Amino acid sequence: MNWSVEWKAFLYVLAAFLGVYYLPVGQPRFDGAVTEALQLVRWYAREHVLLCLVPAFFIAGAISIFVSQASVMKYLGAGARKVTAYGVASVSGGILAVCSCTVLPLFAGIYRMGAGLGPATAFLYAGPAINVLAIILTARILGLQLGIARAVGAVVFSIVIGLLMHFFFRREEEERAAIQAQMPAGPEGRPLWQTVVYFAAMVLLLVFATWGKPEHVAGFWAAVYGMKWWLAGAAALALGLILVRWYGMKWYQLGLLLTVGINFGYAWGAQATFALLTLGLALALWKAGGELREWLDASWGFAKQIMPLLLAGVLVAGLMLGRPGHEGLIPSEWVARMVGGNGLGANFVAAISGAFMYFATLPEVPILQGLLGAGMGQGPALALL
């Protein structure tokens, strides 16, 4: 045995043993935190994986297969004008109702297609913060001032962070740009308007399938919520027709999917039907072969890479801070006590605390409403957003 090599493995095993040996099992705080972690990851799996992440993986896979690399390089590539690249990247998330987890596969998709690290990072940072629903809800509940500050701050800081990432990894980006410059231009793809319509159908399906229930039972948002599955179904039908007309899917495959959706929609409920239709679509893409099977393979690749990391992150967030309104290892009153006022310390604590919290898109607004009512300052609230 070579201890000069094996000592690290021994320390890892020893640390794991001591950690398990001294686990504070039976302590109310620890047991509650473990329960919160499991509750949060279960809620996440039920509320976000099927209706939110699965469509996002399909969109990311479609980006890597159907979006022309020349188009990505033109607007977001390392050789694009910085004003254009960062401008497009920082505001393009405005039309997507995505949370910080859903944006990850989209970020991976555009980066793999040749987008520069800086613009891709700007999109990753700004996307969850500036979608239209989040900005409108923030302005309505937390005030117009915070709504505008959130939108402007997300765009500005995304550009700053993107520029910093480009600076820190400039050598790698220069090498990547040199390799891309030597690559031959790809073949001409479909007309741009067809690609736009195709992605619009998928984005609308994602938006309507994840449309949350508003607080008020009347008004535009409530009306959309009442029709969400009809609207999502219309977007899914449009997507199916597009796949048949432009992408080579067979008519009988679309007919089978429609039959399943109509026959099982009322009996099984929306989510079960959505899951069954997703499996049916995956099977149809696999049977079709060609670029449709490549789309399925790319989507599965993103899911396999990202899902374990996301679930692990949600578990850690639940263990440390618990669900909203519940306790984790870190007492919530500590957070509330440390972020009162608008001082530098409160803003710093809010920013650090936010890094360990998981919020889906929109639920963070009522949570912050409660914190603001408890004395949280406007500055820390914006930092937490």
Placement of each model-derived feature along the sequence:
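N-terminal membrane topogenic signal
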Residues: M1-V13, P187-V196, M227, Y247-W251
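Juxtamembrane and boundary regions of transmembrane helices in multi-pass small-molecule transporters
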Residues: M1-V5, A139, G143-Q194
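Alpha-helical transmembrane segments of multi-pass membrane proteins
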Residues: A15-P28, L205-T210
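Helix-loop-helix hairpins and the membrane-proximal interhelical loops
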Residues: V34-A80, M307-V314, M320-V339
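Small-residue-enriched transmembrane helix starts and helix-helix packing motifs
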Residues: V41, A45-C52, F58, A80-I95, ...
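Structural signature of hydrophobic alpha-helical transmembrane segments
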Residues: H48-P55, A154-V156, A223-G233, Q271-L277, ...
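Membrane-interfacial helix-loop connectors
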Residues: Q69, R81-K82, G93-A149, G318-L385
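Transmembrane helical segments that form the transport core of multi-pass membrane transport proteins
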Residues: L76, L204, A209-T361
